[in-house]
């Protein structure tokens, strides 16, 4: 029966949430810019929470400034905090870009962030003269509504609105919006672009900032920044690209802005599994007007061969529950169906029409009935799994206690993974990344269902 059973959370209380607040996504996007620094216009806890979350997943420090609003700012506003904070940040760190990220407190008090920034920029020009070259981008992320994915999308749209300029000359490049993914995933997508001989503009590139080599700074005078990141000039050039490929459904506002303002075509694909990666590669080849490389076809063949070797023997007929961000859940669900596994539950903490339609397509292609949990949380998933368990779960480390209590093995992926190390370096996108994911799933099944009975492994 090819249909989805949409299950929406009916209670107001969220228990063990699948999403976090908007500023998280905005800070993540800003840190993907070369010599870019976010400054949080809010309390100290707003930045500490995000730094902690990023650190325990990537095992890397995250440079995030904060205006440190206190009780008086809730009454009188945070004008002086923001102006002084931005000026100190520019003078001490000399960033190429500062992203000013709002929070609950600054949004509710109604601070005129853009007006405060104009004052700060005027004072910096007066004090520093030509040495002041930092670009300022205001990012509205009221954290009492929506979630981190919306904050990520708002940040990208703000970068495009503020920085992109139409110079009229086509640069023959393709904009890539990767979404909130791991460094290994971005490197794998860059590898695909290289095989296709296409130069991407990655909006934004967090691969090196969140997985940088530990080496001495090359100069003692310049503040230390991690290597890599998208240069500001590339964001300015994004308006002259030949197309935009988005791996994030919440990056669509940025790609839609590029389409409306600069007439740049856009497409959305999450390259996990065979069909999804095929769609991504076809779009890339069509937009860039290039042929698919033989090396990429070989990588596809290796994935197909791995599926033929493994799927029917160990995976066919099994059931799974997938939870996390909607792009990941939708991509993994389609890949599971290709492996002969039924994604019995697809659980996300948001409601998005692209996700709903995508899951309908997955169910139709596989002729399966999938329970799609919308605006949900891990507590709701736990209750469903108690009634109808699955063979394994796929998602981040936040589901580890459910997996332990119910005796269901957990295949870790997505964000955050904090009870294992190195996962952020291992891609799960593209053909090679899908082989990694296939191996991870299969080894989990072998350990749980075959290892206790060793004779089955000899069959």
Curated annotation (Swiss-Prot):
Record CDD domains: Nitrogenase_MoFe_beta_like (cd01965)
Which Enzyme Commission number(s) are on file for it?
1.18.6.1
Q: Which residues bind [8Fe-7S] cluster?
A: 21, 46, 104, 143
Catalytic activity as recorded in UniProt: N2 + 8 reduced [2Fe-2S]-[ferredoxin] + 16 ATP + 16 H2O = H2 + 8 oxidized [2Fe-2S]-[ferredoxin] + 2 NH4(+) + 16 ADP + 16 phosphate + 6 H(+)
- What does the record note about the cofactor? Binds 1 [8Fe-7S] cluster per heterodimer.
The family database entries (Pfam families) matched by this protein are listed as: Oxidored_nitro (PF00148)
Keyword list (alphabetical) reads: ATP-binding, Iron, Iron-sulfur, Metal-binding, Nitrogen fixation, Nucleotide-binding, Oxidoreductase
Q: How does it assemble?
A: Tetramer of two alpha and two beta chains. Forms complex with the iron protein (nitrogenase component 2).
Spell out the family assignment given in the record's similarity comment. Answer: Belongs to the NifD/NifK/NifE/NifN family.
The name under which this protein is listed is: Nitrogenase molybdenum-iron protein beta chain
Q: Which organism is it from?
A: Methanothermobacter thermautotrophicus (strain ATCC 29096 / DSM 1053 / JCM 10044 / NBRC 100330 / Delta H)
């Amino acid at each position: 029966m090819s249909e989805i059973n949409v299950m929406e959370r009916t209670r107001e209380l969220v228990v063990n949430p699948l999403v976090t607040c908007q500023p998280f996504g905005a800070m993540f996007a800003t840190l993907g810019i070369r010599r870019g620094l976010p400054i949080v216009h809010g309390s100290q806890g707003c930045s500490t929470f995000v730094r902690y979350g990023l650190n325990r997943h990537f095992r890397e420090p995250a440079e995030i400034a904060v205006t440190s609003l206190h009780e008086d700012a809730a009454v009188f506003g945070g004008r002086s905090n923001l102006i002084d904070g931005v000026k100190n940040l520019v003078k001490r760190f000399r960033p190429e870009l500062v992203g000013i990220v709002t929070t609950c407190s600054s949004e509710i008090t109604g601070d005129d962030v853009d007006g405060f920034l104009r004052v700060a920029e005027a004072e910096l020009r007066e004090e520093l003269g030509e040495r002041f070259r930092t670009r300022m981008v205001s990012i509205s992320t009221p954290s009492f509504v929506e979630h981190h994915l919306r904050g990520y999308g708002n940040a990208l749209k703000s970068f495009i609105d503020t920085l992109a300029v139409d110079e009229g000359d086509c640069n023959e490049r393709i904009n890539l919006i990767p979404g909130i993914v791991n460094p290994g995933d971005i490197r794998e997508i860059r590898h695909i672009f290289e095989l296709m001989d296409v130069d991407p503009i990655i909006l934004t590139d967090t691969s090196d900032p969140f997985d940088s080599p530990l080496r001495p700074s090359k100069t003692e005078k310049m503040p230390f920044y991690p290597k890599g990141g998208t240069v500001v000039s590339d964001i300015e050039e994004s308006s002259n690209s030949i197309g935009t490929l988005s791996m994030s459904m919440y990056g669509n506002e940025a790609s839609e802005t590029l389409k409306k303002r600069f007439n740049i075509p856009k497409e959305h694909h999450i390259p996990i599994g065979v069909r999804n990666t095929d769609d991504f590669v076809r779009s890339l080849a069509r937009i860039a007007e290039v042929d698919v490389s033989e090396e990429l076809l070989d990588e596809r063949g290796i994935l197909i061969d791995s599926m033929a070797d493994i799927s029917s023997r160990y995976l066919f007929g099994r059931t799974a529950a997938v939870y996390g961000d909607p792009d990941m859940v939708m991509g993994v669900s389609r890949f599971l169906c290709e492996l002969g596994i039924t994604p019995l539950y697809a659980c996300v903490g948001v409601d998005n029409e692209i996700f709903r339609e995508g899951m309908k397509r997955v169910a139709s292609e596989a002729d399966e009935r999938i329970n799609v949990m919308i605006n949900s949380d891990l507590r709701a998933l736990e209750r469903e799994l108690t009634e109808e368990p699955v063979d394994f779960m796929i998602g981040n480390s936040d589901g580890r206690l459910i997996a332990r209590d119910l005796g269901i093995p957990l295949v870790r992926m997505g964000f955050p993974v904090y009870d294992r190390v190195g996962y952020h370096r291992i891609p799960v996108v593209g053909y090679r990344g899908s082989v990694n994911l296939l191996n991870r799933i299969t080894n989990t099944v072998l350990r749980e269902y075959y290892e206790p009975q060793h004779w089955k492994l000899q069959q």
